[in-house]
Every structure is written in structure tokens, then in C-alpha cells.
Amino acid sequence: MEEAKKKIQSLIEKYEQVLNSGKIGDYSEQETKNAFITPLFEALGWDISNKDEVSAEESQKSGGRVDYGFYLNGRLVFYLEAKPLKADLEREDFAKQAIRYSWNKGVDYAVLTDFEGLKVFNSQIIEGALMDRRIFEINYKDYINNFERLWLLSKESFQNGLLDKYADEHSKRLKKIPINEKLDKDIQECRKLLTESFRMWNTKEDIDLIDEGAQKLLDRLVFLRVAEDRGIEPHTLKELSRDLGSQREKNKKDVYQALTSKFRELDDIYNSNLFSEHPFEKWEEHNQSTEEIIEILYGKPGYYDYDFSAIPSDVLGGVYENYLGHRLEKSKKGTAVSKDAKKRKEQGIYYTPTFIVDYIVKNALSPILDKCFISALFCHTFSSCQAA
């Protein structure tokens, strides 16, 4: 800690020289990172040169990127969003940028800094104002005077869970709502809304077919949200909902009908069971439940936004397994359950977590692919020699 203080004191003096020279505005974000932010976290014990410990500029498929991800024993512990010297850290969009990505990734903490100031947020708090999510903030002038607080972002601190303890003591973790819990709750709410709406407007349809149709429509909407955020499909769901909803009296076609027409186009594009024709496409739905569900799948403006390109596949897999559990529980109570769900139950077919997939690929496929690569390289070299 004493060695860290010396290094940070040197950075403070360097910053004040730049400040007094009036050249603060000349520093770009990258120059700020190189000259101040990276050395600051190196002083706090992080190995910036080790990509397994600190990743630089993790990209988001929905656009943009996050500056640094900090890992401990392979586990992501916080994301850091860097800004150029003299940036206005009070701007809410800066903080939300860091918080949004961390929350969707299921990471507890988000850090925002331009070196002059530093803010730490609990990204898992989604209710209340932005200040409710802030765990602490500190100005560069207090980096040494209040070093114990700055040290909460050190590698040693995370090894000992010190930031967790600090957040608990200051009641900054009590309202924590992880992405997996929130998404699962919202998906359940969407399923309930759809099922009730279909039952209301299609009284002659079989109840089990109604449930199946509701899940099929929900599957398609989630797929489209993922495709939108990954840049595979344009952002059409919200625009469709808003455009048709705002002109409801003029339009003979509502959002639900427009979507069912769109599904026929998507079936030609993706040629998969997901978009194959289903009876629900000819059902009635006139209480705007589909519009409400689309809004839910985008998140709650000002509190949290779903970014399906950042949400780990484990989260989506867990949500779907919860649905299968729901279906199987209904079967125990005498309600019919789909053959697909029964098959998964009987044969032990469940979603495989990412870390297990990575382990299997690394230990089963990698050795084989390495041999293939070596063989191909040998053949190429041998052929080149023959040609020569």
C-alpha cells in the first residue's frame, strides 16, 4: 500500500502540472488512459498487460464498447468506463453507459473516471435515482488523504471482498436485482400477459394450444430482440409498435397482425422451426398485449435497458430452463405438457453453461484441431518444397 501511495502521489503531481499548464483540454481519452488511468490501476495492483486480468475495449455487438474489464481468477469483477481529462463526470449518460453494460453482463460494479474524479456504482440496483446506485466517489485531491477508499478498487481488495463489505455497510447492496432474476421475472410477466390475452379473444381454442402459442410468440420476440442488439436485424419491433400504436384509429392493422405478417418473411429468411406457421398467427389479439410485451423486452427507460448482445448466454439458458420447470410442474398437476418438455425431462436434456462448453471445446476439440492445423501446415510446406 505504501508503494502504491508513492506511485499515485507521482500521478497526482503530474496531473497538477498539466492542470497548471492549461493543457487539460489537449488530452484525448486515449492519452488520458495511457498517462493517468492505466498507471493508477497498475498502482492498485492490477496487471494491465495481462489480458486475462484486464481486457481493453470489450466491444458490444449493439454498438460502442467498454474501456476495461477487470477479472479475478477468471471472474469479471467490474467494468471501467474512461473519459478524457476534465470531462464532466456529472453527466448522467456517462454513468448510465457504464452501468448499463455492467448490469447486462451480470457484473456488480461499474466504475467511471477521468482520473480527476472517480465514481463507483452498484450496477445491479435498478430502482430509484442514479445517486442511489452510487457506492462512493472520490476526487484526485483525496486519493492519498482517503486512500483506504481508493484502495477498495485494488486487486487485493477484490481478493478479500472489501468492496462488497463496504457496500453492505453503507446499504448499497440491499436492493440488488441481478439481470437473470429481472429478465426471468419479465419473461414470466410477458408469458402471462400473452396467455391471458389469447384466452380472452380466442375462447374456442384449446387451452394447451393457447399456452403453446403464447410461448411460440414470446420465443420469436426474444429472438428478434437478440438479433436487433447483435446487428443481425434492424431495430424494428419498437418502431413498429410506436408507429402503428400512434395511428391506431387510422390503421386497420394493429401491431399483432403486422407481426404475424412479418413472421412469414422471417420464415423464408431463417427457414427454421421457430418461424414455421403456427395456429396463433390467425388468432385475435385486440388489447395491445403484444405492444406491452415489446416495451418490456426493451427495459424500463431511466432505470435499466436490456442489451441482448451483452447478456450472457447462461442467463438466457437459465430463463428457458425455468420455463421448462414451469411446464413440467404443470404436468405433475395433471395439465398436459409438450412432448419437447417431456423429452428434455426424460433424457436429461438441459441448457449447457458456457464454462462447461468452453471446457469441452478446449479439452476435446482443441487437441484434434491443433493436429489438423499441424498436418495442414506440413502438407503445405511439403508441397511448396516439391514445387521449388
Language-model segments: residues:
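A short, conserved, highly charged catalytic patch centered on acidic carboxylates
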Residues: M1-Y109, G117, N122-L152, F158-Y166, ...
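Short flexible/disordered coil segments
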Residues: F115-K119, S375-F378
